[in-house]
Amino acid sequence: MALIDAIHAREILDSRGNPTVEVEVLLSDGQIGRAAVPSGASTGEHEAVELRDGDKGRYLGKGVQKAVDAVIDEISPALIGFDATDQRSIDQAMIDLDGTPNKGKLGANAILGVSLAVANAAAASADLPLYKYLGGPNAHVLPVPLMNILNGGSHADSDVDIQEFMIAPIGAETFSEGLRWGVEVYHNLKAVLQEKGLSTGLGDEGGFAPNLPSNRAALDLIQEAIKNAGYTPGTDIALALDVASSEFYKEGAYQFEGKALSATEMSAYYAELVADYPLVSIEDPLDENDWEGWKTLTDTIGDKVQLVGDDLFVTNPVRLQQGIETATANSLLVKVNQIGSLTETLDAVSLAQRSGYTTITSHRSGETEDTTIADIAVATNAGQIKTGAPARSERVAKYNQLLRIEEELDDAARYAGRSAFPRFKG
């Protein structure tokens, strides 16, 4: 039995140049686990609290020294001597120590950093890769990468409302093949943009961020790039969206493409998109508090396309249960820092999968070189992962880890492919 001997934390930088928390956990057998915490740009109002210092004279108020101090001064003394394999008790001890419903005292960034570092240390102590430690012998499904190759919304400085336009290589036989297809489309998209005199500047997640006249124009450009790369839209490579609609929901209406639209009008818009394009997934199509609109949308097109709750569910089992009971949405986006501990994340995934919801393991727009989510995706047989474009090392790090996992699994590896999207009829 390996016990927790010491816990240390520090401030490091994320991919946007903002501070974040990194934690190291030392076990009694000498093994060390390390984890760094991501940060979102478009955050749901129901997410656990990311503790920032607020000192405008240091990192423009975005320092995380308070969270670092919480790890060193409060969490560490409370966890010394715990069995590192008892993840649930460790996470619960931190939740109890915090004592708030949203981890607002210690900070979800402090608690999550320790939670993930403990798991990494325990896996090292067991001489197992993290995905096998967490998922056991059944952890063998490689996820379809939802690759964000064109950015709009709060991830880019452009007139495109939808935040992410993604490609999903559903027709590939293996993860490595699917990744290659995605990379080839990404480079072909750059060539298409250059040919049309459009910007090839990058957004937060490595996707291109051109100024386009409409959201449909973005989908048309991506389909052109897919064809130029030698693939067939809908058969080889499908499309997916993250609308992040809470970002443009103002005063009871969706401020979309220059108009103020109702939930019913937005639903009609999405129904047209699903009819016109090979869309397998639409994330956050409506506001995080618009449960009535979400229910209507699910009833309208939920049998044809994956409808993903990100801001709606914030990886929270309580909010997810509300969705399940009302048959609202049909997929859960899984972001470890939304709920703030590994145990609660795995509980949410388990609840979703038992209830017939698909799951997508996801990064945040502010990322680090930490690859824990790649292992979580395989450990939970999620079938899908969102970790940005095949560019920028903080995104590519996760893809490279999945390549290593696929190689290690060898003949046992199975690529989720088209089966990850059971509602897609294209």
Swiss-Prot record:
Pathway: Carbohydrate degradation; glycolysis; pyruvate from D-glyceraldehyde 3-phosphate: step 4/5. Belongs to the enolase family. SUPFAM superfamilies: Enolase C-terminal domain-like, Enolase N-terminal domain-like. The gene is eno. Catalyzes the reversible conversion of 2-phosphoglycerate (2-PG) into phosphoenolpyruvate (PEP). It is essential for the degradation of carbohydrates via glycolysis. This is Enolase. Binds a second Mg(2+) ion via substrate during catalysis. GO terms for biological process: glycolytic process. Its EC number is 4.2.1.11. The keyword Secreted applies. Mg(2+) binds at residues 242, 283, 310. The lineage of its organism: Bacteria, Bacillati, Actinomycetota, Actinomycetes, Micrococcales. The active site is at residues 205, 335. Gene3D superfamilies: Enolase-like C-terminal domain (3.20.20.120), Enolase-like, N-terminal domain (3.30.390.10). It is found in: Cytoplasm; Secreted; Cell surface. Keywords: Cytoplasm, Glycolysis, Lyase, Magnesium, Metal-binding, Secreted. GO terms for molecular function: magnesium ion binding; phosphopyruvate hydratase activity. The keyword Chloroplast does not apply. InterPro entries: Enolase, Enolase-like_C_sf, Enolase-like_N, Enolase_C, Enolase_CS, Enolase_N. It catalyses: (2R)-2-phosphoglycerate = phosphoenolpyruvate + H2O. CDD domains: enolase (cd03313).
